[in-house]
Each structure stands twice: as structure tokens, then as C-alpha cells.
């Protein structure tokens, strides 16, 4: 059955998901603050800043008016970086109160909040009143927007403690090239989605320094061990980390040049300064903020995360990237299961 869906956030992932939902037969309105971006989407059906050369469905409508996008929507999909998530959630909450609507909320945000280190679903549950929403579903997994745009085969996870809501999201998104599995482990799905960006920066740095496949494989594998340890410390199911929102998302993000976190790490490995990398990218590099969050959380929970600690020193204390990588190899020898 066709649903009326509001998609908040018109970056690469938000706009491509909105386009796919439109082609799945749903009535979709895409919201963005940027008037020029909305004009291009509505008249030229393009989004050149984020998806160069991709042409969007003529049935997809964009607007700068969030109330217009949300009015009558049974589903709200939020695809906003963590830094701006609360502001959008509060604006949405006020609109839902005014409209007396209670939609299903789905988010595809990957990261942890600065300072509080909260997961996206925690932020949304605080800022969108229970009377204004149904459950909150997490959509996560190995899914570059560029691949989904060309209808390359993709599989992701819809995670929610209420499996009926996860199954509803599953039906909304699934099609011949985009397969959705369900999971009830929101904590694991969100930690996997956020922390993999840290390891992707490290993987990019490894290659930027000139190391090859063995080094990259070692870093990704040991990085997964770190992600699992921290997630489990917060109550996640360890099995989630060998699924799509865990190892799946990690592999695609830490091995692909489409990953902005990998590209940022690669430039750091080549000797560029962090601020120059950020300026050059022109987009949010979630892994930079997530590194600090994970570093602080690991210290509070006394969880060993040596790769994260090394990258924290590079990103926030100015340590040389090559020195940090060398120190990882010089650590005391230990069991793989520790």
C-alpha cells in the first residue's frame, strides 16, 4: 500500500532514499533548508552538490517548508547529520503537535552526539514527544548512495525494539535491488553505524601512508573487535556486529573511495592537516566527531579501544599519523580474544 512519506534531509543519502521510495510507489516530499537545492530538484530533477549527474524521479517533490512536507505523512524519514539532528527533531515535534499527527519515525543518521555522546534514537526520543510519534526505527547497513542510485544490489537492516514497526519499514524500502532485514537490537545497529566511521578514517590513513592489503585487513578486523566491545558494554547483542549494520557497514565504509571518512583518512595519511581535509571535503565527516565520543565512552566504561585512542591522538592532540600507527604495532603482545 502506498504511504505518504516526508523525508527530512536532502544530502546524498536522504535524496537517494527519497527517490527510491518514490519509485517504490509512495507519495514522497523531500525537505531541505536550501532554496536553490529545492529549486533544482523540482525543475531540473538534479542535486549536483551531492549527486553529480544523477537524475531524480519527476514524481519526487521537494520543499523548504517542513510543515508542508510533513502534513498528512504517515511516515517521517530523518536523514540529518548528528550535529543538526536535535534542531530538526524539535522543529518536527512542534509541527506534529500543531497537526495532531503521530507518524512512524525512521532515521538513517550515523553518529553519536557531541558532548552527550548519545545515539540518534536517544536524541529523537527526547525531542519528539511520545504522543507525536509511533516507534523509532533505525535504517542502517552497507549502503553508499552512489550504488543505490544506480540500483546496485544493496542489503540493510531496519532495527526497532517493536518488530512490527521494523517490518513496516522493511516493506516500505524493499524492492528488487534493495533488500531490508529486521532486527530488534537498536543499540547494536546504532553503535555499528557510528563507530565504523572511526575505523574507516584509520583504513584510509593506512592506504594514504602507503600500506597495502594486509595492513588494511588487520586494521578493519581489529577495529570490528573494538566496535563490538564498546557496543556490548552498552547492552548491544554481540551478534549484531557480524551482521549488516556491523561488519557489513564497516567493510563498505573502510574500503571504498565513495566513503567520505575513508577519503578523509587517506588525506591525513598523505600528510594533510585535519582542518585542510575538512575544508577540502565540504561535507560532514562524522568519524571525526565520533572518534572523540567513542574515546570518552571507552574511558568511562573501561573498554580497550587502541585504534580509536590512536586516532583520537591524531585528530585532537596533533600526533603524527605515522607515529600513531607504528605505536599500534609496538603494543604489548596479547590474545586475539582480548
From Swiss-Prot:
It holds the Pfam family NAD_Gly3P_dh_N. Its EC number is 1.1.1.94. It catalyses: sn-glycerol 3-phosphate + NAD(+) = dihydroxyacetone phosphate + NADH + H(+); sn-glycerol 3-phosphate + NADP(+) = dihydroxyacetone phosphate + NADPH + H(+). GO terms for biological process: carbohydrate metabolic process; glycerol-3-phosphate biosynthetic process; glycerol-3-phosphate catabolic process; glycerophospholipid metabolic process; phospholipid biosynthetic process. InterPro entries: 6-PGluconate_DH-like_C_sf, 6PGD_dom2, G3P_DH_NAD-dep, G3P_DH_NAD-dep_C, G3P_DH_NAD-dep_N, NAD(P)-bd_dom_sf. Pathway: Membrane lipid metabolism; glycerophospholipid metabolism. Keywords: Cytoplasm, Lipid biosynthesis, Lipid metabolism, NAD, NADP, Nucleotide-binding, Oxidoreductase, Phospholipid biosynthesis, Phospholipid metabolism. GO terms for molecular function: glycerol-3-phosphate dehydrogenase [NAD(P)+] activity; NAD binding. NADPH binds at residues 12-13, 33, 110, 145, 260, 284, 286. The active site is at residue 196. SUPFAM superfamilies: 6-phosphogluconate dehydrogenase C-terminal domain-like, NAD(P)-binding Rossmann-fold domains. This is Glycerol-3-phosphate dehydrogenase [NAD(P)+]. It comes from Limosilactobacillus reuteri (strain DSM 20016). The gene is gpsA.
